[in-house]
Amino acid sequence: CYARLKEYDTYNDEPLVLFDEKESNFNFTLVTATNRVVNTGDLYFTPVKGNDPNSVIMRLNTGEGSHLDFTYTLKPDDYMVQYQILGTGLNGVLAPSTNALDLLWEQDIRQQEKGRKFEDRYVTLNYKFMADDVEHLSESKSDSKQIPNRLKWIGYKDMFFSTVLISQEGFEATTLDSKAIPEGDVLKQFKTTT
């Protein structure tokens, strides 16, 4: 996983990278039909050629005629990556009670601007309820919140840029964590579980 904004640089003229594979984790937990718990981050997905030149399909083959596809689509001149999960022939592979996937999303928010203290005041974990206003965890200290209500989106924001996960159906039973890091290149560590 790697997200770089090509039109922008950090205060010291380095490429502006929102996150890379060392600073982020995006993982789903699956329960198999034999009650094994597996994490998608531990599995091997292979790229599959699709019809859309703006899309990448990563496929987890689970047996003859069955697979799990993660499709990433980035339209030209857009920053919004469309992400779709599609399972084919997974009856007998996943537990019959599977009706949703448990998500773990972690990201370190690195310092991008020259003034660490000033920038740190703007680094927040924001979230929006399906039919309500935007809320956020504390900007100044470590914070955690369990939210039973459905969320429309969750955003990890630094001073000027955000990484946002949006759901059409909403996220349920979400736990949000923000850990303040007092020194070094990382300002905060954000974590979301659903």
Residue spans for each PLM region:
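Soluble non-transmembrane domains of integral membrane proteins
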Residues: C1-T194
